[in-house]
Amino acid sequence: MAAKPGAATPTYSPKIVGRSRLPIFKDSDLDWSRPDGRGFHQCRPALLQTGAVSSASGSAYAEFGNTKVIVSVFGPRESKKAMVYSDVGRLNCNVSYTNFASPTLGQGTDHKEYSSMLHKALEGVIMMETFPKTTVDVFALVLESGGSDLSVLISCASLALADAGIMMYDLITAVSVSCIGKSLMIDPVTEEEGCEDGSFMMTCMPSRYEITQLTITGEWTTPNINEAMQLCLDASSKLGEIMRDCLKQSASASDE
């Protein structure tokens, strides 16, 4: 796990104090109290664990507040489908929700849009040429939907791939921001997503400080986008450190 027993669960909130430029939007801009009591620029604690599924090549469990997901990775293995020879491997991603994950989403069915977005987020970071003619399957399951589900899934999937020994250019982290009125709220929960005017999700390789994907919905001003990007970059850097600590602790435990 990323946190030792008895220790406080780490958070990846972006650093606001000490920045050269103050945030454009402040908590006082809107008479809004976050359901879980956090500040607008405060992320939920991130609990991470690898090796959650013993039968998988690699796996990870992530718990960000009430959002709980588990990701299993199988492979590289020979594809069951006949495929033309390729110098690079093949990546399959599947996202599903348990029946009890959410009153509205918990249908136990696959979510094709999330599966596609997870695939896009991961394919750019995996060294596909290291497993030609074979397939890596990523199965992501949302145990409990508590908000920012996709960003948690992407970060957890990256951790599971690392646990499986899949070669990557870097870990990949994902962070979401909701725009409600004039205020930006990082790592939104379900209630906040339900009344947001716009959503923003960024995936990046934290060690390289390189953005790999942006997903923006709703109406955003240029200052809004710039502020959201900085918040996500700061949070991604901290989340990357938490993920690397989790992998180090897992490796140390395996050596004992």
From Swiss-Prot:
GO biological process: rRNA processing; seed germination; seedling development
Short name of any one Pfam family annotated for the protein: RNase_PH_C
Functional description taken from the UniProt entry: Non-catalytic component of the RNA exosome complex which has 3'->5' exoribonuclease activity and participates in a multitude of cellular RNA processing, maturation and degradation events. In vitro, is a processive phosphorolytic exonuclease and requires a single-stranded poly(A) tail on the substrate RNA for its activity. Plays an important role in seed germination and early seedling growth by mediating specific cytoplasmic mRNA decay of transcripts coding for the abscisic acid (ABA) biosynthetic enzymes NCED5 and NCED6, and the ABA signaling transcription factors ABI3 and ABI4.
Main location: cytoplasm
Organism whose genome encodes this protein: Arabidopsis thaliana
Gene3D superfamilies (UniProt xref): GHMP Kinase, N-terminal domain
Biological classification of the source: Eukaryota, Viridiplantae, Streptophyta, Embryophyta, Tracheophyta
Record keywords: Cytoplasm, Exosome, Nucleus, RNA-binding, rRNA processing
Protein name: Exosome complex component RRP41-like
Assembly, per entry: Probable component of the RNA exosome complex.
InterPro entries linked to this entry: ExoRNase_PH_dom1, ExoRNase_PH_dom2, ExoRNase_PH_dom2_sf, PNPase/RNase_PH_dom_sf, Ribosomal_Su5_D2-typ_SF, RNase_PH
Disruption phenotype: Extremely slow growth, especially during the early stage of development.
Cellular compartment(s): Cytoplasm; Nucleus
Family, similarity comment: Belongs to the RNase PH family.
